[in-house]
């Protein structure tokens, strides 16, 4: 690359110059560092965003897909019947449950592996504990090239060692790029549908959202708080309460008459008592019990509708939020794949840099300093990525 002043940039910093001129707002332009792996909010894979996704998935894996599971999920006793109309809800929940189970068993481990790849690469470049990182060893190679101008054999060896280390780093960056592409592909399937990792057709969260919206409209029309049935149930409950109150009052009055029957004398009182007990009292008792049972059933149905539809509305909201977070996650993983490509290209530029160019560049220790600065950046991102992996399941 020829600059306006006629100077030629060495190959290993050409891409950095392009970054600097095209994006003057970039905080770091070291071509050997993890540029882009850190945003203004921290590590590129945000723990807060993924915690939300995990919460959604945890809910999804526990969705009820039959009457028995629904009763346990919302706390309905076995005496309460669940109409067949709700079977359409189970079908949608089953699709979502499969997606969420696939996420937990396959996709989320890939997300963690991507973060672990970043951490492993960072520690490989920067070192960890007593283990020297590649960049520090490459600094030694650069020094050996610079200090052995009189010994071409030593220079050539140092240059070949530097190229060999670059080759290893390039190979790993390319592997991690392919892995990030794989996550993006499967994440896209999770959101938009396709085939999962086992070759099964899945409809995706977007289609689940559409299906649930249709079911929601249908069930709201049949059982929602604005439905004719709901209004009828409310009126029925109100009428039954009034009727039950009247029956209980009549029952109490009759009980008083039974007790007062003995005022007629022992013999006549006993006869009147038996007649009342066998006829009126039993009749009113049965009426009270029947009214109470009917009222309980009506209240149970109202409770059932409120609980099941309430859960459905909550899931609908969760899906809306999940799609928003999922689209952001897809952008992140596509960006990570792109970053790995740039890292591979940058280290490739260094690998292709001639021995003479390194000698010239190292007159002001630029490459040596560049490697040291990049090592510090990689160590920082490696620790953040490691923290994400270690705390991924912590709410």
Curated annotation (Swiss-Prot):
One of its GO terms (biological process) is sporulation resulting in formation of a cellular spore. Keywords: Sporulation, Toxin, Virulence. The keyword Transport does not apply. The keyword Repeat does not apply. Transmembrane segments: none annotated. One of its GO terms (molecular function) is toxin activity. Belongs to the cry6A endotoxin family. NCBIfam families: alph_xenorhab_A. Endotoxin with nematicidal activity. This is Pesticidal crystal protein Cry6Ba. It comes from Bacillus thuringiensis. The gene is cry6Ba.
């Amino acid at each position: 690359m020829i600059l306006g002043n006629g100077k030629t940039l060495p190959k290993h910093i050409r891409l950095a110059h392009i970054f600097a001129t095209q994006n003057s707002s970039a905080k770091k332009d070291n071509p050997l560092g993890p540029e882009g792996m850190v945003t203004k909010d921290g590590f590129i894979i945000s723990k807060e965003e993924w915690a939300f996704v995990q919460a959604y998935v945890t809910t999804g894996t526990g969705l009820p897909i039959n009457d028995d599971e629904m009763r346990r999920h919302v706390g309905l006793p076995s005496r309460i019947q669940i109409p067949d109309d709700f079977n359409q809800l189970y079908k949608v929940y089953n699709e979502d449950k499969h997606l969420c189970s696939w996420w937990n068993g396959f996709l989320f481990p890939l997300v963690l592996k991507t973060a672990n790849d970043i951490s492993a690469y960072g520690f490989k470049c920067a070192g960890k504990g007593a283990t020297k990182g590649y960049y520090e060893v490459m600094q030694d190679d650069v020094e050996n090239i610079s200090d052995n101008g009189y010994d071409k054999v030593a220079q050539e060896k140092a240059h070949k060692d530097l190229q060999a280390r670059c080759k290893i780093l390039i190979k790993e960056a390319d592997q991690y790029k392919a892995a990030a592409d794989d996550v993006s592909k499967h994440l896209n399937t999770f959101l938009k549908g396709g085939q999962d990792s086992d070759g099964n057709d899945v409809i995706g969260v977007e289609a689940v959202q559409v299906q649930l919206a249709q079911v929601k409209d249908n069930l709201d029309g049949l059982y929602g708080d604005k439905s004719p049935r709901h209004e009828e149930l409310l009126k029925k409950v109100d009428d039954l309460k009034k009727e039950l109150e009247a029956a209980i009052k009549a029952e109490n009055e009759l009980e008083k008459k039974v007790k007062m029957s003995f005022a007629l004398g022992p013999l006549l009182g006993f006869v009147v008592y038996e007649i009342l007990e066998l006829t009126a009292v039993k009749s009113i008792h049965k009426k009270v019990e029947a009214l109470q049972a009917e009222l309980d059933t009506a209240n149970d149905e109202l409770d059932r509708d409120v609980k099941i539809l309430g859960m459905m509305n909550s899931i609908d909201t969760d899906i809306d939020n999940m799609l928003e977070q999922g689209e952001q996650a897809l952008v992140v993983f596509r960006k990570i794949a792109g970053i790995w490509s740039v890292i591979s290209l940058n280290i490739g530029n260094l690998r292709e840099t001639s021995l003479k160019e390194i000698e010239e560049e190292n007159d002001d220790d630029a490459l040596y300093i560049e490697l040291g600065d990049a090592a510090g950046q990689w160590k920082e991102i490696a620790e953040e990525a490691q923290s994400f992996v270690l705390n991924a399941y912590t709410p």
